[in-house]
């Protein structure tokens, strides 16, 4: 059945297809349609897992970027995910980069996007999170507005942290999108140190204010040198971050040279990222020595490579591009088998 749906949406522009899918899932979020979708999907329960002090119904999650504004939380939830990461969201709504900005690499099962954090702003997202009936864990992925300077960047993250804290199962600090100018600079040196220090200080204040501890993860890029990765791991440990998501999209085109759309600028996700993200997880796991849990993301399209990420050191997994190419059966297969 999904093959038929996929055939239809693949005739559309990639972003229009995405928006259409979100509208379908939003419709499926309606209590009238939920039982129908549930009976069609037959989502398995999976294996509960506690990571970052949070109880996840199962270790399979939806990666950020799929539901930027939290418009289809209950629809995605019906597919069987143990957790959903919504966002990336910024303090103020922004349009993102010029269209077209999403491109399929069908033969490689990849996607290139240069969206640029297009979203309706944190307040809009929080309303959707508050209204969701989904019983799994909701992570909120936060970023900075394009017009905010690097020097003022941490203020945007603190602003979003304040708004999201009371409504999130966990919060992700996204400093690794390649589509916001200079954003990845926040992963390095004094910027990184300063950002994490500010975030941890604010987390302590909010934990006291709301009388609950909400863990904070950092999402990193796959395009790191050995020394950069070591430095990032050291900084994460030093600031006692609660988790790390490895990885975001890649700017490399090594695996897709010569393919249609490969020349498009932006971050490449899907199968071409599979090996690279697993290698980063492996190296990160060696550096972190179990002190900080890893959430694995990047090119998961089946049980075998999902298992490879677990063996490399990931405790939770996230999918997005694989869902586009393989449909709900991918989620079902992973939830049924991954512990």
Swiss-Prot record:
Predominant location:
membrane
Q: Which cofactors are named for this entry?
A: FMN
Listed under GO cellular component are: cytoplasm; plasma membrane
- State which pathway it belongs to: Pyrimidine metabolism; UMP biosynthesis via de novo pathway; orotate from (S)-dihydroorotate (quinone route): step 1/1
Question: What keywords sit in the KW lines?
Answer: Cell membrane, Flavoprotein, FMN, Membrane, Oxidoreductase, Pyrimidine biosynthesis
Give EC number(s), comma-separated.
1.3.5.2
Top enzyme class, one word, equals: oxidoreductase
Does the entry feature the keyword Iron, yes or no? no
Membership in a protein family? Belongs to the dihydroorotate dehydrogenase family. Type 2 subfamily.
UniProt-recorded name of the protein:
Dihydroorotate dehydrogenase (quinone)
UniProt organism field? Haemophilus influenzae (strain 86-028NP)
Q: What is the lineage of its organism?
A: Bacteria, Pseudomonadati, Pseudomonadota, Gammaproteobacteria, Pasteurellales
């Amino acid at each position: 059945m999904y093959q038929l749906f996929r055939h239809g949406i693949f005739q559309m522009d990639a972003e229009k297809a995405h928006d259409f899918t979100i509208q379908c899932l939003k419709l499926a979020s309606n209590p009238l349609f939920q039982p129908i979708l549930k009976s069609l999907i037959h989502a398995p329960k999976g294996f509960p897992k506690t990571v970052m002090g949070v109880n996840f119904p199962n270790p399979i999650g939806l990666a950020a970027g799929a539901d930027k504004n939290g418009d289809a939380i209950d629809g995605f939830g019906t597919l069987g995910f143990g957790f959903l990461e919504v966002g990336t969201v910024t303090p103020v709504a922004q349009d993102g980069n010029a269209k077209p900005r999403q491109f399929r690499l069908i033969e490689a099962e990849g996607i290139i996007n240069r969206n640029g954090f297009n979203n309706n702003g944190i307040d809009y997202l929080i309303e959707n999170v508050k209204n969701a009936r989904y019983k799994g864990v909701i992570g909120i992925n936060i970023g900075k507005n394009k017009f905010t300077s690097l020097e003022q960047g941490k203020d945007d993250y603190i602003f979003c942290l304040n708004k999201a804290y009371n409504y999130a199962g966990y919060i992700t600090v996204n400093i690794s999108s390649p589509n916001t100018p200079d954003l990845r600079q926040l992963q390095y040196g004094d910027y990184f140190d300063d950002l994490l220090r500010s975030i941890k200080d604010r987390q302590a204040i909010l934990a006291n204010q709301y009388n609950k501890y909400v863990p904070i993860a950092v999402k990193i890029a796959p395009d790191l040198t050995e020394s950069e990765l070591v430095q990032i791991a050291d900084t994460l440990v030093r600031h006692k971050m609660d988790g790390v998501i490895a990885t975001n999209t890649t700017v490399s085109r090594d695996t897709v040279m010569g393919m249609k759309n490969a020349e498009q600028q932006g971050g490449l996700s899907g199968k071409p990222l599979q090996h690279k993200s697993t290698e980063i997880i492996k190296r990160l796991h060696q550096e972190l020595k179990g002190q900080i849990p890893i959430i694995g993301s990047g090119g998961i399209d089946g049980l075998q490579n999902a298992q490879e990420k677990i063996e490399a050191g990931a405790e939770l997994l996230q999918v997005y591009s694989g869902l586009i190419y393989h449909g709900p059966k991918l989620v079902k297969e992973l939830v049924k088998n991954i512990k």
